Amino acid sequence: MNKIISILKPTGMTSHDVVSRVRKILNIKKVGHTGTLDPDASGVLPICIGKATKVCEVILNKDKSYICELTLGISTDTYDASGEILKKVDDFKFSNEDIERAFDTQRGEINQLPPIYSALKVNGKRMCDLVRSGRQSEITLKTRRVNIKDIKILSIKGNKVMFYVECSKGTYVRSICHDIGEYLGCGAHMSFLNRTSSGKFDLDNSITLEELELFYENKTLDKYLYDIDYVLDSFNYVVLNPNAIKYYSNGGSIDDKRFLKNNFDKDDEFVRVYSTDNFLGLGKLSKHNNTISVKSDKMFI
């Protein structure tokens, strides 16, 4: 099985726990996830199976969206509800306009400082592990450029603010909550997080682990198994002449005289490569004089 399936991760499980369950249910060893969701978070977690693990990075690089709850007045060291409380402020009062202005600081391209309790690595070690082992002095936090493509408040009830956010790879929603609290001066942390989409996967085409087990046993899982090229539709394509397939599959470079069909642009670096019947993989284009050729970069056959 070389497919992609999107799982609705429940709270209380790590992303690796989900991978382990999928391995056990499907009895397949080669399984990988496409972007860590913290144990306290829930939602969409695409899982790659078999040769589809080669495109984990492609899905990881896609935009993601979340529903999040921010709690004003309480700051924690992890920026979420699992951490130690660093500051508690009770006597604050903000208008909805004040809170809207704070959210406006988290819109568009921004420089974001990640939480020190994160899986980002310093010299091969996760920052959260370094902190927990008393080696925080080895860490120098650096801002990262991220893109908050959409952020909107859904409701404000007391010190709880529910909001929707769509953002680029590498964005920490915990940091958004923390930074809004710092802007307002009362502190804040993330008290709930549900990922609603990851690339082309959302709540509608994702299933629970219980459904995965049931559908697999009943042989009705096919509806939720996606081909590898489903997540590669941002790449243009080339269809090869049948007599070029073997040479291409063995690492040979195929020039455009043996393309049956294509829709690539002159500036494309990679394309999807097909035979007349099957998806073969991703190919890398090269140009020499007036000839364009394609050579295998990732094979999926």
Swiss-Prot record:
EC annotation from Swiss-Prot or TrEMBL: 5.4.99.25
The keyword Cytoplasm belongs to this UniProt entry's keyword annotation: no
Signal sequence region: none
Pfam families reported in the protein's UniProt record: TruB_C_2, TruB_N
Residues the record marks as active site: 38
Catalytic activity entry: uridine(55) in tRNA = pseudouridine(55) in tRNA
Principal EC category: isomerase
Keyword set includes Cytoplasm: no
GO BP: mRNA pseudouridine synthesis; tRNA pseudouridine synthesis
Gene Ontology molecular function: RNA binding; tRNA pseudouridine(55) synthase activity
Record key words, sorted: Isomerase, tRNA processing
Transmembrane segments: none
Family stated for the protein in its record: Belongs to the pseudouridine synthase TruB family. Type 1 subfamily.
NCBIfam families: TruB
Classification via HAMAP family: TruB_bact
Function as written in the Swiss-Prot or TrEMBL entry: Responsible for synthesis of pseudouridine from uracil-55 in the psi GC loop of transfer RNAs.
Protein name from the UniProt record: tRNA pseudouridine synthase B
Biological source species: Clostridioides difficile (strain 630)
Classification of source organism: Bacteria, Bacillati, Bacillota, Clostridia, Peptostreptococcales
